[in-house]
C-alpha cells in the first residue's frame, strides 16, 4: 500500500492514490491539476522515506474535483445570569482533491488505478451492442 503524508493548509494528511480528500479552500479552479511538494513521508509498500522536514524530490499529483462547504457548526455563547446569548453558525470552505499519483525522484510509486467495475463493464458492453444494432 503506497501512501504519503502531506501538509496543506497547516494540517497534515495521510493520502493514498485513487482516493479523495477535503482540505481547506484552495484558490484553484475545478478540474485543474496540482503538484503538492510539501511531502513529509513517503511509503511505497516496502520502504518508508522520512523527510527532515520534507522529502527531497517527492511530489503528490492531485486534481481539484470541486469546491464545497462543510456542515454547519453552531457556536453558542452565553453569560449566565445576564440574559446575554449569541448563537452563530459557521460553515468551513473546503476543496475536494483527488490524489492521482505519488512521485519520488521522478518515479511514480503509486498511481490511481483505472479499474472498471462489473456494472460499468456491463454498461459498456450494452452500449457496444446498441451501436452494432444502430449500425445495421
Curated annotation (Swiss-Prot):
Assembly and oligomerization: Part of the 50S ribosomal subunit. Contacts protein L20.
Keyword Ribosomal protein attributed: yes
InterPro entries: bL21-like, bL21-like_sf, Ribosomal_bL21, Ribosomal_bL21_CS
GO CC field: cytoplasm; ribonucleoprotein complex; ribosome
Gene name in the database record: rplU
Recorded superkingdom: Bacteria
A Gene Ontology biological process term: translation
Presence of the UniProt keyword Aminoacyl-tRNA synthetase in the record: no
Role noted for this protein: This protein binds to 23S rRNA in the presence of protein L20.
Keywords recorded for this protein, A-Z: Ribonucleoprotein, Ribosomal protein, RNA-binding, rRNA-binding
Family: Belongs to the bacterial ribosomal protein bL21 family.
GO molecular function per UniProt: rRNA binding; structural constituent of ribosome
Protein name: Large ribosomal subunit protein bL21
